[in-house]
Amino acid sequence: MLIFDSGVGGLSILKNIKKILPNIHYIYMLDNESFPYGNKTEFFIIQRSIKIIHTIKKIYPINIVVIACNTISTVALSILREKFDIPIFGIFPHIKAAEKITKNKIIGLIATKATINSSYTQKTIYEYSCSNTIKIIGTNKLAVIAEKKIRGVAVSQKKLKNIFRPWINLPTCPDTIILGCTHFSLLEKEIKNILYKTRSVYFIDSIKKVIFQIKSYLKTSNVNQKIKKNIFLYSKNNNNLKKLLSFLKQYKFTVIKHINLN
């Protein structure tokens, strides 16, 4: 199984996969050279995704791919499924689930600008905005803050307030917030403190949905594990990566190495 993202947000998906499939072996591709995907063009996102899968598939016998990134999923998933002959799972902003949960009919969607601007997300927003008010924040800054938090950097309340200012000033805030990026679940507590100090809010991410899809597929398919180790690959060697190594210990990677994607 290959799981890839430009940052550590995808590790939240890996963590949940390990819970339901403790014996599965996996490759995590940290494309930190391209972090964040959210500020890249659709052309770059598509070509980079193809390059990642193609390069790793030549080296390792992967039989499932999990795109642990809303931006790539909304922009490139259909193209990747046409190009490769292995099952590819993606993660999407779960607006349908939010509609079922919201009480005040005001739904918040936080995602990268590329995810917000994708035709998939625009179509979904249009579909559900008839019966709900959907408040949108498109930001590439939140993923950077989440990455820094993982590496031990304190979360700046000032920066968070600047990002969420459009909602802070609303007379009625969304009671349900869709986390449209796998990084954002790392900041749930901080977001709640900024917006809802005395009120409750329901956060929705799509991790459970994609985990269910993967589990269902594995139950009905005869997939043989050909990878016998847990492997962590990265595309750029820098100081941030060194700070991440202690955090990675919990995932029991036996191989950590650089891979050239250029």
From Swiss-Prot:
Keywords: Cell shape, Cell wall biogenesis/degradation, Isomerase, Peptidoglycan synthesis. It comes from Buchnera aphidicola subsp. Acyrthosiphon pisum (strain 5A). It catalyses: L-glutamate = D-glutamate. Disulfide bonds: none annotated. GO terms for molecular function: glutamate racemase activity. This is Glutamate racemase. HAMAP family: Glu_racemase (MF_00258). Pathway: Cell wall biogenesis; peptidoglycan biosynthesis.
